[in-house]
């Protein structure tokens, strides 16, 4: 009797959960194409005593497997207290997210401007070509922001256009000829240069694009700023807070906050979801996969082990018969500012080795479905009919049902008791512990 072939995604999950006897290849940190370590994957665009701006390397330069992310970049911004990132615009859409600290974000339009007080968890889309500036008004706390950039002119590349002329860069106004500037401003070039450019007075130029502010300047800027919307997540053009509503998944071991394109116009325009996840030390975000979204995971605080399961690409051979599927495990130890990419349909699991918080951008997010492979709720394996379970698994349907019911938690579980037990038996590495924690 011929056995029925089971859908590939469930096979992947089955292999991941039950260690089905197939060939398994493991790729660790540095050979992992989905892992971008903070220490060697970011390029510093600007840095002085007031802060820095860093740009993550292009995803498709890291690996051809990330080609579908060629149009996206990750930007990290940090600034000291009482500072401002000077006015500029870029040929890219930005989705800005506040990781820690406070900020005043001002968006400048042709005939108006809008200023907003931002707090941790606040997000805001900045459309391409919008002039904006960013203040850290706090007296003691640093500001930390992550931005997803989507360039509009060149795939994977964008430019910042600063109005100010500093020691770090020229004002884009300096690109125009003198007579054009004189006609445009109806003034002599000497006056334009003295007031706006300072080409011959370098000693008066700022040291860079992040500069200090006085207490009085901050007080004036703060007076004009509005608070972000914490009552609604559906704002079309104002900041919204990712963590202001109840988490979509929550128990004693973790919390999962998310806003999808269906709930927010700014995210709908970009086809992106935003997630912020807290996991307690020693706990596990259970194995699951996203149906169509590619997830860019950024570690904000803490450390974690992550395991991702895919199918190894088969080599072209002259033989006509099919090769057996070879499962490949990608594993990495993640820490603050590290980035990890999770392709659509690839099952993965996150084990927090300290209290953990990470942010996730979901690309191609509309109508994405999250499918858990273990746990009591939202478990795709539990929805498979008994007759099909008999064909798909070596155990009986009763055995499968009994196994799946052993895990009474959902979404997050405590892996520490299992890890201690495995440690006492002399086993090494996180994978056996992760498997044992599931059932």
From Swiss-Prot:
Residue ranges annotated for the Cupin type-1 domain, each copy included: 34-193, 240-401
Species: Glycine max
This protein's encoding gene: CG-4
Assembly: The alpha-, alpha'-, and beta-subunits associate in various combinations to form trimeric proteins.
Segments for region (Disordered): 411-439
The protein, known as: Beta-conglycinin beta subunit 2
Glycan attachment residues as annotated in the record: 351
Location(s) in or outside the cell: Vacuole, Aleurone grain; Endoplasmic reticulum; Protein storage vacuole
Described function: Seed storage protein. Accumulates during seed development and is hydrolyzed after germination to provide a carbon and nitrogen source for the developing seedling.
Origin: domain of life: Eukaryota
CDD domains linked to this entry: cupin_7S_vicilin-like_C, cupin_7S_vicilin-like_N
Signal peptide: 1-23
Post-translational modification (record): The N-linked glycans are not essential for the folding and assembly into trimers.
GO (cellular component) term, any one: aleurone grain
SUPFAM superfamilies: RmlC-like cupins (SSF51182)
Recorded family membership: Belongs to the 7S seed storage protein family.
Main localisation: other
Segments for region (Necessary for sorting to protein storage vacuole): 430-439
Keyword set, alphabetical order: Allergen, Endoplasmic reticulum, Glycoprotein, Signal, Vacuole
Highest classification ranks of the organism: Eukaryota, Viridiplantae, Streptophyta, Embryophyta, Tracheophyta
SMART domains to which the protein is assigned, alphabetical: Cupin_1
């Amino acid at each position: 009797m011929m056995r029925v072939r089971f859908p590939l995604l469930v096979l992947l999950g089955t292999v991941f959960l039950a260690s089905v006897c197939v060939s398994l290849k493991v790729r660790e940190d540095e050979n992992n194409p989905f892992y971008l370590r903070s220490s060697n994957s970011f390029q510093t665009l600007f840095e002085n005593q007031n802060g820095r701006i860093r740009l993550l390397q292009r995803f498709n330069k890291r690996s051809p497997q990330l080609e579908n992310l060629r149009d996206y970049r990750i930007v990290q911004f940090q600034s000291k207290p009482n500072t401002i990132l000077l006015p500029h615009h870029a040929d890219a859409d930005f989705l800005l997210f506040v990781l820690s600290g406070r900020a005043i974000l001002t968006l400048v339009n042709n005939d108006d401007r809008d200023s907003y007080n931002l707090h941790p968890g606040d997000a805001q889309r900045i459309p391409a070509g919008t002039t904006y500036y960013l203040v850290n008004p706090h007296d003691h706390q640093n500001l930390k922001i992550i931005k997803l950039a989507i360039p509009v002119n060149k795939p994977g590349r964008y430019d910042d256009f600063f109005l100010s002329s500093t020691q770090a860069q020229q004002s884009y106004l300096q690109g125009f000829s003198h007579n054009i500037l004189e006609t445009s401003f109806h003034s002599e070039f000497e006056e334009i240069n003295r007031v706006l450019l300072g080409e011959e007075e370098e000693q008066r130029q700022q040291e860079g694009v992040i500069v200090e502010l006085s207490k009085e300047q901050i007080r004036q800027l703060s007076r004009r700023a509005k608070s972000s919307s914490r009552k609604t997540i559906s704002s079309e053009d104002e900041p919204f807070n990712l963590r202001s509503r109840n988490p979509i998944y929550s128990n004693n071991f973790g919390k999962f906050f998310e806003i999808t394109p269906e709930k927010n116009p700014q995210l709908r325009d970009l086809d992106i979801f935003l997630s912020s996840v807290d996991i307690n030390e020693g706990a596990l975000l259970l194995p699951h996969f996203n149906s169509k979204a590619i997830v860019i995971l950024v570690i904000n605080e803490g450390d974690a082990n992550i395991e991702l399961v895919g199918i190894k690409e088969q080599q072209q051979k002259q033989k006509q018969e099919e090769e057996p599927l070879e499962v490949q495990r990608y594993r990495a130890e993640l820490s603050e500012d590290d980035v990890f990419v999770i392709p659509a349909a690839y099952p993965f699991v996150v084990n927090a080795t300290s209290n953990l918080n990470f942010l996730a951008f979901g690309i191609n997010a509309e109508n994405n479905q999250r499918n858990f492979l273990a746990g009591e709720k939202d478990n795709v394996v539990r929805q498979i009919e008994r007759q099909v379970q008999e064909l798909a698994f070596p155990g009986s349907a009763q055995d499968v049902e009994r196994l799946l019911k052993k895990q009474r938690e959902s979404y997050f579980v405590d892996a520490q008791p299992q890890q201690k037990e495995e440690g006492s038996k002399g086993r090494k590495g996180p994978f056996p512990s992760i498997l044992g924690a599931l059932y």
